[in-house]
Amino acid sequence: EIRKVTGVQTCALPISPGTGICHQVNLEYLGRTVWTKDEDGRTYAFPDTLVGTDSHTTMINGLGVLGWGVGGIEAEAAMLGQPVSMLIPEVIGFKLTGKLKEGITATDLVLTVTQMLRKKGVVGKFVEFYGDGLADLPLADRATIANMAPEYGATCGFFPVDEVTLDYLRLSGRPTQTVKLVEAYTKAQGLWRNAGQEPVFTDSLALDMGSVEASLAGPKRPQDRVSLPDVSQAFSDFLDLQFKPTNKEEGRLESEGGGGVAVGNADLVGEADYEDDGQTYRLKNGAVVIAAITSCTNTSNPSVMMAAGLVAKKAVEKGLTRKPWVKTSLAPGSKVVTDYYKAAGLTQYLDKLGFDLVGYGCTTCIGNSGPLPEPIEKAIQKADLAVASVLSGNRNFEGRVHPLVKTNWLASPPLVVAYALAGTVRIDISREPLGNDQQGNPVYLKDIWPSSQEIAEAVAQVSTSMFHKEYAEVFAGDAQWQAIEVPQAATYVWQKDSTYIQHPPFFDDIAGPLPEIGRASCRERVS
């Protein structure tokens, strides 16, 4: 109701809840790259810019729009027409060359970029991507990289406008006139990316995308990239730290004549049985209890989303199922995703593995994963287990995804599906089987991983008509939204029985008029 009232009173058009994640909606529909304004009988064109109250506002940088996250007061000031002031930042150039290898995803790329830029140190700086590698980098991949600017510490991660930008504007249904304007304006203003350009930056670094490996990030920080074969060892290292006594403990024991404390073998501890639907299961350290395809970081990217659907399809066809202790979910950032899943015939396979649609929003990425089944929560608490989540999000700090989940791993959507099948991060899924097929034969990740050609054929199902369909009535909302009655008033009409928002008492007891005093009075006397 607050959102709808705000829209009515400011003549703005608010987008109703349940439509998707604001950053993805902005990328797919709202962003224009170049805006126009009519004034004094003339039309002026100027670059699209954006400030938002969420750190991942930077996603729009992938569309050639300069934008970043700000505080609430700054955003409110901008709404009221005030400028956003800032010091001119350093600009770090990030040169991309080559192409991703077969089987490597945009998620693997962004985790590599995040690791490199964190090591470089770009806090408070702009990062601009350049190099001939951009010519083969789809806009969805650019948006994925731009989205994680907060994780690599930059104010923004900017991609200049080029033919790839125009292709995406056309695909997502922007008017032809808008696309023509973007091309003409950016070329005239020197904002267009030309092949072979070597801009001048404060500093720079480079990456050959052909060197990128299949990766996850974890267990606690998005910049801690781990190659897929090393995830099991990274988890064991985490356990060693958990079981290792502090220096204070070792010193105390040694001072009392002991020889210190030997670090126990983590494999010998950390398991608990639980019952579910008449079956007894054993939960161990490293068990994946949450596998979530979530977040605008990846759900805005058709290639990794289609890859997840294809992995699910191949897994179901081979008779694989998710492990019973894994809570799975699918929460895209826009309704376009479910449209292209249906068009590609992949929805049924995701559903069979438990990746049912739970809504269009941030969900698990911001900690809204919901409770785990009670028997599993009790088992975790009983044995103080170090369990895991695997999600296609952008942050994995301990306690963020779920308070009982100590290790959290960022991964591409297809790897999220794979770990739901494996049920643990304690095996090397690049070499060890995920399960057995109907004949009892082991099934490996390579057996269900789609080729680039298969992914491309699936991505070809994404059409402009899907964007037109989902955004045609985006401001109208559903029946519940339309049923909300909004009073026609200049200010908000406070409701005394509201449990959500109440009239603030800040101005109820303001002091009366200042008393008349003589010239010789000091502030102590006034107070």
Annotate the PLM regions:
Residues V5, A287-V288, G354:
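Immediate flanking context of iron-sulfur cluster ligation sites
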Residues T297, L350, V417:
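Hydrophobic, well-ordered secondary-structure elements that form the walls
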Residues T19, V25, G31-E39, T43-Y44, ...:
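Non-catalytic terminal/interface segments that mediate subunit docking, oligomerization
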Residues C11, I293-C296, G333-K335, G359-I366, ...:
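Functionally engaged cysteine thiol sites
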Residues E1-C11, A520, E524-V526:
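Single conserved hydrophobic/aromatic residue that forms the stacking wall/gate
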Residues G196-Q197, S204-D208:
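Structured, non-catalytic alpha/beta "coupling" segments that mediate domain-domain communication
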Residues Q348-F355:
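Glycine-rich and small/hydrophobic secondary-structure elements
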